[in-house]
A protein has these predicted regions:
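C-terminal and inter-domain tail/linker signature
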Residues: 1-255
């Protein structure tokens, strides 16, 4: 396990799940810690000001990291949180940047309520997480980049067969099953317009993207995770969070 991935895991699990926020953020972050989770201020003290009260409010914290993607200096993780015996359940997606020592220096995220029932019948976070096909990393990243451009941004849905398998499994809570359900969701007003692809990371058969979408009068940060086989998307997950108004930010913003 690379040092940066190990540090991300430990910050998440030691710092938040186990409640050792102060020691974890001091050990696993670098000279700066730029924060894009808008409720959290920059730096060690910003992290502590948010998470020490969070730990106190939520003494029962079940946190499971479902999947990791490591791409150079970046680590992406996809996690499930159940707080206080399931009184609150969340899906979180996070991207971390690191310095040359593998210490965390920047963080982006989205959080949304975990939904027990989805339109496709698939669980929001379930599914494979094994990284394989490392030799196909660059090809798969390029394929997802074109998918975002041609399908999500340009809405050339007649090209969907070039990117998605017929049996594509969809874990989006608001998309119906299959490739047709996926297209219908991307055409909907609730999905809206995919304005900007901000980051794209990949490792083997998994690729994750962060983008800004605009739907129903609001800007959102949208994470998507794709699993590919033979160059086609065979499974996908999402996590979408509305961006709070500027006067509610404690840092420079989501991006």
């Amino acid at each position: 396990m690379a040092k940066v991935l190990d540090n991300v895991r430990k910050l998440y699990l030691e710092g938040i799940r186990d409640g050792n926020a102060r020691s974890a953020v001091q050990k696993y972050t670098g000279d700066r810690y730029t924060q894009h989770s808008t409720g959290v201020a920059d730096g060690v003290e910003g992290f502590l000001a948010f998470f020490e009260p969070f730990v106190a409010r939520n003494p029962d914290r079940e946190i499971e990291i479902i999947r990791f993607i490591e791409d150079g200096q970046y680590v992406f993780c996809h996690a499930y949180q159940s707080l206080n015996g399931g009184s609150a359940k969340w899906v979180t997606t996070d991207l971390f940047d690191s310095d040359t020592n593998g210490l965390i220096v920047e963080h982006w995220d989205a959080i949304s309520p975990y939904q027990d029932v989805t339109l496709s019948g698939e669980d929001m976070v379930a599914g494979p997480n094994e990284i394989i096909d490392l030799d196909k990393t660059n090809y798969n990243k390029a394929q997802v980049h074109e998918f975002v451009k041609q399908i999500l941004q340009e809405k050339q849905f007649h090209l969907i067969d070039q990117f998605c398998a017929d049996t594509c499994v969809t874990h989006f809570p608001k998309a119906k099953a299959g490739k047709e359900g996926l297209v219908s969701w991307f055409q909907s007003d609730e999905f809206g317009q995919y304005d900007m692809l901000f980051k794209l990371v990949g490792e083997g058969n998994f690729v994750a993207t962060i983008g800004k979408t605009y739907a129903q009068g609001k800007e959102h940060i949208s994470f998507h995770i794709y699993r590919l086989e033979q160059g086609l998307i065979v499974e996908c997950w999402d996590n979408v969070e509305a961006i709070a108004p500027r006067d509610q930010w404690n840092n420079s913003g989501k991006f």
